Amino acid sequence: MQTNLLKPKAINVEQLGPNRAKVALEPFERGYGHTLGNAIRRVLLSSMVGYAATEVTIAGVLHEYSSIDGVQEDVVNILLNLKGVVFKLHNRDEVTLSLRKDGEGVVTARDIQTPHDVEIVNPEHVIATLSAGGKLDMQIKVEKGRGYVPGNLRRYADEATKSIGRIVLDASFSPVKRVSYTVESARVEQRTDLDKLVVEIETNGAITAEDAVRASAKILVEQLAVFAQLEGGELAAFDAPASSRGAATFDPILLRPVDELELTVRSANCLKAENIYYIGDLIQRTENELLKTPNLGRKSLNEIKEVLASRGLTLGMKLENWPPAGLDKR
């Protein structure tokens, strides 16, 4: 009787666009398609390293709820646009960049002054629009990180580094925008009960889709390696810093605002009316609870369920110690 598990022998990569690809692997033993597909998908969404703007200082601006003479967008919209700029740092973990422009015209990511080892992947991305006599002068701090980090959860070891006018941003470091996987039937000789795993991935251009899949697989291998090294007895205890003991660790996707789910305006407004601001708030609600929300019907509920399912989440989940300390409940 055959006791060895099958391993994929065929790998096919299909380019679907500049930053999109479909990776297919086969054959897998029955059930392994979902086991590995879900693991890779969760790692791709939550654990990839990337770069993002984390702090901004704008000349003449004290806080984000300001406006700038001669600039059509208010500061909030400028910051939102800035979050859409895709950075790529080579051989460094952080950098402070300058953007200075005056006179009528559109300000794009191309106007950001960068050293030779900093790359802007989408230089045509619009940041602001200047009217005649308008001027925009800002300093942008870009850092390397992982996942999603809300600005209000960031901590500074040196309180003296805080200064008036410095705006801390929510940072989405992940270069992966969307991931989905499907499991199809595969056949090897007379066996027809096998799996074919198809992973479709879209990135922001800072990393290719193929490299993202490789990186996620490497993370999984490193995490699982410890199980292959068990020799009995106890593993060395992890001595966590006193400041972090007892603190719950949540999947970064749960700390993201529900706005990032890109729901219809009707659904988004209904959730905010119920004080549901974060994805972690949403998944703890049941279907019956949401249906009791004014103006939220079955169609909106189905939309919410589909969007959550695309991220490997469902309604009615339980989270211990939610919300985390310091999470802004707005």
Curated annotation (Swiss-Prot):
Keyword Nucleotidyltransferase among UniProt keywords: yes
Reactions catalysed, as given in the entry: RNA(n) + a ribonucleoside 5'-triphosphate = RNA(n+1) + diphosphate
A GO CC term attached to the entry: DNA-directed RNA polymerase complex
Region of interest (Alpha N-terminal domain (alpha-NTD)), residue spans: 1-231
One Gene Ontology term from the biological process aspect of the record: DNA-templated transcription
Keywords: DNA-directed RNA polymerase, Nucleotidyltransferase, Transcription, Transferase
Enzyme class per UniProt: transferase
Entry's free-text remark on domains: The N-terminal domain is essential for RNAP assembly and basal transcription, whereas the C-terminal domain is involved in interaction with transcriptional regulators and with upstream promoter elements.
Protein's UniProt name: DNA-directed RNA polymerase subunit alpha
Organism of this sequence: Acidovorax ebreus (strain TPSY) (Diaphorobacter sp. (strain TPSY))
Upper lineage: Bacteria, Pseudomonadati, Pseudomonadota, Betaproteobacteria, Burkholderiales
